[in-house]
């Protein structure tokens, strides 16, 4: 039997602390990221049992989910939000955990902050009480979301019981066409696998189209691994990864970095390793993507007609499509460009990094947001905001009629003041288009930052390729 291993298996095996017969192994956890929503009860549990945080140096907290993007006033998003943020401050102070609070220069969305500070490194196990922790897998780390009781367990022990997952390889062969982004790639993947196709698996994304991506693009892809049902998504580290890491606040320096890179270079799937499942896509066939339904797998190319429920052979998919079309207020056979958008949101842990800001600004420059559209640009962190302002992107956005906001999760989820009203239609760069995700009865269409900016200007969805050809 071959000893060849996948990248996931290498990282998993390296972190097994205890493997008792008949039980799931206990894994050591290298980094624990904490935010205000899923941590209060976990800290309460420590307090009740008289426990400390086992490794404060490996635990980092920030405020992101329910912060206001219009003011640094802790009261702005309502009483529950204020309580959660104040509680996080008290808990971090009491237990000695590093906190990047509302007024800190490193505050931001947890999955933007971790990578940009060098907290996230290849080969690590990383957890957070948040669904989209898979983002960090872009660095070749095993990163996944956990529940609040597990947050307490990791705070107390720096370990977690974790069953071995099945492995899936998603191979995006060849190069994408001009103007096709990481968001289009991952939406096309989910369109093929469906929103449940990765259930029970840890996915490794491979292929030329993936290795061609920048680190920010790779984070977008891994961020949405959970949206095809996977436990986590990984991309093997390479020179692109090492160049991104070098010089960041918590990254290894000098000789330590050289030694780390030597180890990180071994973090790749062995040539003869076998995956439990393989999915292949032709990158050249991927077009700009827009979701039409109420899960990320209900997605089409921007120039394709809205599908008819009867086009689905599976009765469950057919029923789901009927329900989604009714909720979204769409008619099969029509084009998504036939429908006006009311709001546009560029942000979230999927697409709020500096390259996302630049992509949206390139479309916004010299143009104007349609009069009936409210368009928000929400940088993912204070660091992203500062860099964007240094480059003058905020001025481009404001002159075009976009709102330039403060960092936070914002309109990705209805936990702060940025939300949709009933039946409002939104072009959003976030990761979930579930019913009510952005506000009760709100209608969410997931797109790339460039596609979102273009929709803001046209007032409806347009094929980004027609705009870039004119530019």
UniProtKB/Swiss-Prot annotation:
<feature type="binding site">
    <location>
        <position position="409"/>
    </location>
    <ligand>
        <name>[4Fe-4S] cluster</name>
    </ligand>
</feature>
<dbReference type="InterPro" id="IPR015931">
    <property type="entry name" value="Acnase/IPM_dHydase_lsu_aba_1/3"/>
</dbReference>
<dbReference type="InterPro" id="IPR050067">
    <property type="entry name" value="IPM_dehydratase_rel_enz"/>
</dbReference>
<dbReference type="Pfam" id="PF00330">
    <property type="entry name" value="Aconitase"/>
</dbReference>
<dbReference type="GO" id="GO:0003861">
    <property type="term" value="F:3-isopropylmalate dehydratase activity"/>
</dbReference>
<keyword id="KW-0479">Metal-binding</keyword>
<comment type="pathway">
    <text>Amino-acid biosynthesis; L-leucine biosynthesis; L-leucine from 3-methyl-2-oxobutanoate: step 2/4.</text>
</comment>
<dbReference type="GO" id="GO:0051539">
    <property type="term" value="F:4 iron, 4 sulfur cluster binding"/>
</dbReference>
<dbReference type="GO" id="GO:0009098">
    <property type="term" value="P:L-leucine biosynthetic process"/>
</dbReference>
<dbReference type="GO" id="GO:0046872">
    <property type="term" value="F:metal ion binding"/>
</dbReference>
<keyword id="KW-0456">Lyase</keyword>
<keyword id="KW-0411">Iron-sulfur</keyword>
<dbReference type="InterPro" id="IPR018136">
    <property type="entry name" value="Aconitase_4Fe-4S_BS"/>
</dbReference>
<dbReference type="InterPro" id="IPR001030">
    <property type="entry name" value="Acoase/IPM_deHydtase_lsu_aba"/>
</dbReference>
<protein>
    <recommendedName>
        <fullName>3-isopropylmalate dehydratase large subunit</fullName>
        <ecNumber>4.2.1.33</ecNumber>
    </recommendedName>
</protein>
<feature type="binding site">
    <location>
        <position position="349"/>
    </location>
    <ligand>
        <name>[4Fe-4S] cluster</name>
    </ligand>
</feature>
<dbReference type="InterPro" id="IPR036008">
    <property type="entry name" value="Aconitase_4Fe-4S_dom"/>
</dbReference>
<comment type="similarity">
    <text>Belongs to the aconitase/IPM isomerase family. LeuC type 1 subfamily.</text>
</comment>
<keyword id="KW-0004">4Fe-4S</keyword>
<dbReference type="InterPro" id="IPR033941">
    <property type="entry name" value="IPMI_cat"/>
</dbReference>
<keyword id="KW-0432">Leucine biosynthesis</keyword>
<comment type="subunit">
    <text>Heterodimer of LeuC and LeuD.</text>
</comment>
<comment type="function">
    <text>Catalyzes the isomerization between 2-isopropylmalate and 3-isopropylmalate, via the formation of 2-isopropylmaleate.</text>
</comment>
<keyword id="KW-0408">Iron</keyword>
<keyword id="KW-0028">Amino-acid biosynthesis</keyword>
<dbReference type="InterPro" id="IPR004430">
    <property type="entry name" value="3-IsopropMal_deHydase_lsu"/>
</dbReference>
<feature type="binding site">
    <location>
        <position position="412"/>
    </location>
    <ligand>
        <name>[4Fe-4S] cluster</name>
    </ligand>
</feature>
<keyword id="KW-0100">Branched-chain amino acid biosynthesis</keyword>
């Amino acid at each position: 039997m071959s000893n060849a291993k996948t990248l996931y298996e290498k990282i998993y095996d390296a972190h097994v602390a205890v493997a008792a017969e008949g039980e799931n192994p206990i894994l050591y956890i290298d980094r624990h990221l904490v935010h205000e929503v899923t941590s209060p009860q976990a800290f309460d549990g420590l307090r009740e049992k008289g426990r400390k945080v086992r490794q404060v140096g490996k635990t980092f907290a920030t405020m992101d989910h329910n912060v206001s993007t219009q003011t640094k006033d802790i009261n702005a998003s309502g009483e529950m939000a204020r309580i959660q943020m104040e509680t996080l401050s008290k808990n971090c102070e009491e237990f000695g955990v590093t906190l990047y609070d509302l007024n800190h220069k490193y505050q931001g969305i947890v999955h933007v902050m971790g990578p940009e500070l060098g907290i996230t490194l290849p080969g690590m196990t990383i957890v957070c009480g948040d669904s989209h922790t898979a983002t960090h897998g872009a660095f070749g780390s095993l990163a996944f979301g956990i529940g609040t009781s597990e947050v307490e367990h990791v705070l107390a022990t720096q370990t977690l019981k974790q069953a071995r997952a099945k492995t899936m390889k998603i191979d995006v062969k060849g190069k994408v066409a001009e103007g096709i982004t990481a968001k289009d790639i991952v939406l096309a993947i989910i369109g093929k696998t469906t929103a449940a196709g990765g259930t029970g698996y840890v996915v490794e994304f491979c292929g030329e189209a993936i290795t061609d991506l920048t680190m920010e693009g790779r984070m977008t892809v891994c961020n949405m691994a959970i949206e095809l049902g996977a436990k986590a998504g990984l991309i093997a580290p390479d020179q692109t990864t090492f160049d991104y890491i070098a010089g960041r606040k918590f990254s290894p320096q000098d000789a330590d970095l050289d030694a780390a890179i030597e180890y990180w270079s071994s973090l790749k799937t062995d040539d003869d390793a076998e995956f439990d499942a393989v999915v292949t896509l032709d990158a050249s066939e991927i077009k700009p993507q827009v979701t039409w339904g109420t899960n990320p797998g209900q997605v089409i190319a921007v120039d394709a007609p809205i599908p008819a429920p009867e086009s689905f052979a599976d009765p469950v998919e057919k029923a789901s499509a009927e329900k989604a079309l009714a909720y979204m207020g769409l008619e099969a056979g029509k084009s998504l460009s036939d429908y006006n958008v009311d709001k546009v949101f560029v942000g979230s842990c999927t697409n709020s990094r500096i390259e996302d800001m630049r992509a949206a600004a390139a479309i916004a420059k010299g143009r104007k947001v349609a009069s009936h559209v409210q368009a928000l640009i929400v940088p993912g962190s204070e660091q992203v905001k500062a860099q964007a302002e240094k480059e003058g992107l905020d001025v481009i956005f404001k002159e075009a009629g976009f709102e330039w906001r403060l960092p936070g999760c914002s309109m990705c989820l209805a936990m702060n003041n940025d939300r949709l009203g009933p039946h409002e239609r939104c072009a959003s760069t976030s990761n979930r288009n579930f019913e009510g995700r952005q506000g009760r009865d709100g209608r969410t269409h997931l797109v790339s930052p460039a596609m979102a900016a273009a929709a803001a200007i046209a007032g409806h969805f347009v094929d980004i390729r027609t705009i870039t050809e004119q530019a």
